[in-house]
Amino acid sequence: MNSLKFLDFCAGIGGGRIGLENLGMKCLGFSEIDKDAEITYGEFFGYDEVNYGDLMQIEPEDLPDFDFMVGGFPCQTFSIIGNRCGLDDDERGQIIYGLVRILKAKDVKYFILENVKGLIHHDKGNTLKVVLKLLDDAGYRVYYEVLNSLDFGVPQMRERIYFVGVKKELVDDSFRYEFPKKYSGKSESLEECLIECDRTLIFDESLPAYQTFYKYLDNKYNNGKHNIDELLSHEYRVLDTRQSDLRIYHNKTPTLRRGRHGILYVREGQFRKLSGYEALLLQKFPKRYADKVRGKISNSKLLQQAGNAMTSSVIEEIAKSFMKAIGEKK
C-alpha cells in the first residue's frame, strides 16, 4: 500500500488521514473550510500542506491524480440528534454530490466515506438508497456497514456508517467484501486515555457549576437515584450529564460529539471534566499528535474538533482489510 496516494476530503483535523498513513499511504493534500480545524490540522501535519478549500468549489483539474479518497462528509443533515433534514435540505446535504463529482472526474480507484448511523433510517431508508445509487452510477462496487469505535481499539461508544468502494473494472463479479469486526492493533484502555493532569479540570464545590450539578442530581429525572459520595466511589466511572437524565458508563465513554458538554469522570476521588487532549486519545489520535496542540489550541475547540473527527483506528482497519480483499499488498 506504500505506493497509494490519497486526498483527505471534509478532513476536519485528520483522523482519516492518520488511519491511512498508518498503512503507508501518502497524503497529497486535504479539503477543509473550517478555519479552526485547519489550524489544528496544520499543527498536526505541518502548515505547508495544501488545502484545496471548499469541496463544492474545487475544479477537479486543479487536483493531483490520486488513488484513494477518504472523507467524513458532514453529518448534520442526517444525524439522529439533528433536525432530520436530508439530501434536499441545504448545501451540507449536497456534499455527497461534490464527492461523487470528484470521484468520477479523477477516476479514483478506491474510497472510504463516513457518516452518522442515522443516515440508514433517514427518510425511511430512501436517503441511503440515493447515496448508494450515486456511487453505483459513478462506477463503483460499494459496501457499507455500521461499526462501533469501541471495537476498534478505543474505549468510546461511537457508531458510524462506513462506505467503501472500488472501481468496478478493478474487481470481477465474484468479489465480495466483509468489514472487519475488531481492531488488530493495540487497544487503549480508559485509564490510558483519561490521563490529563491539569488541575483546572477538576470539578468540585469551588465551582459555581458544581452547585448546578448538585441541583441536577435532585431534578425530577434523577431525584433519589444518585448521590455524590456514591458517584465518587468508583474510579474511572464516566458520567454523561444529559438534560433528561444522568447516564453512567464503566470502562468506556459515550459518543464524543461536536457541542457536547457535560462529560465528567472520577479519578482519585474527584470529578474531572473531559479535556480536549483526552478526547483526541479517545479518537485514537497518537499522543505525539495530541502533544503538538497541548496549550496551543483551546480545550473547548479541541473537544468540538475531536467530536467531529473520524476514529483513526476504524479507518485504518477498514482500509487494511479492504485492500487485502482487493489484492493490494502493503
What label would you give each PLM region?
Residues 2-107, 117-121, 126-129, 133-136:
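Core alpha/beta nucleotide-donor-binding catalytic domains of modification enzymes
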Residues 64, 155-160:
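A short, glycine/Asx- and small/polar-enriched loop/turn
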Residues 52-53, 117, 140-151:
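Conserved S-adenosyl-L-methionine
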Residues 1-27, 134-138, 160-330:
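S-adenosyl-L-methionine-dependent DNA methyltransferase catalytic core
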Residues 152-155, 247:
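A short beta-turn/loop motif at secondary-structure boundaries
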Residues 109-113:
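Conserved beta-strand signature within the Rossmann-like core of class I S-adenosyl-L-methionine
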Residues 127-148, 166-168:
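Charged, glycine-enriched surface loops/patches
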Residues 115-121, 149, 305:
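Short glycine-centered, acidic/aromatic-flanked micro-motifs in structured strand/loop junctions
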